[in-house]
Amino acid sequence: MNLYGYFLLLIIVIAFIALLPLFSGIGTFKLTKPKSSATAQSATGKLGKREYLKKKLDHTNVLKFDLKDTEESLGHDSASASSASRKFEIDSKTGLKRRVIGQYNKDPNDFDFDIDDLINEDELDERREEEKKLKKYNGKKNEAYEGFV
């Protein structure tokens, strides 16, 4: 590939990355007309440094990206609706939120299953395997045991 091919590939990749939020429905791009810089310069004395820089940035950006509101997208988008319905616990030490998957019982004596049933199932499996081995050797125990050694 020559230089033009790489340049074209780069433009396609950048355009695809820029358009991904539009395809997924997260937000929209808006083109705005830049406002005159005279109004921004005259207000320099009244505004602080942070406000001045924020207004200057707003005036210079022609292409703006706006995220959709969560209230609007709850009814329309199933992905955001499922993420909004998740429950979180707040950790008391760090204050960070943690996703709640389920409440678990930490009592070691409380089981979800019956141990006797599991033991009986294992015994049945062992009997079935032994019967299969005996059928393989046609009920000849001595030959069956010799085959295992």
From Swiss-Prot:
Phenotype of gene-disrupted mutants: Lead to ER retention of PMA1.
GO cellular component terms, A-Z: COPI-coated vesicle membrane; endoplasmic reticulum; endoplasmic reticulum membrane; ER to Golgi transport vesicle membrane; Golgi membrane
Protein species of origin: Saccharomyces cerevisiae (strain ATCC 204508 / S288c)
Additional record remark: Present with 3260 molecules/cell in log phase SD medium.
Alphabetic keyword roster: Cytoplasmic vesicle, Endoplasmic reticulum, Golgi apparatus, Membrane, Signal-anchor, Transmembrane, Transmembrane helix
Protein origin, superkingdom: Eukaryota
Full protein name: ER export of PMA1 protein 1
Keyword check for Endoplasmic reticulum: yes
Lumenal side stretches: 1-6
Subunit structure: Interacts with PMA1 and PSG1.
Gene: EXP1
Membrane topology category: Single-pass type I membrane protein
Keyword Transmembrane helix applies: yes
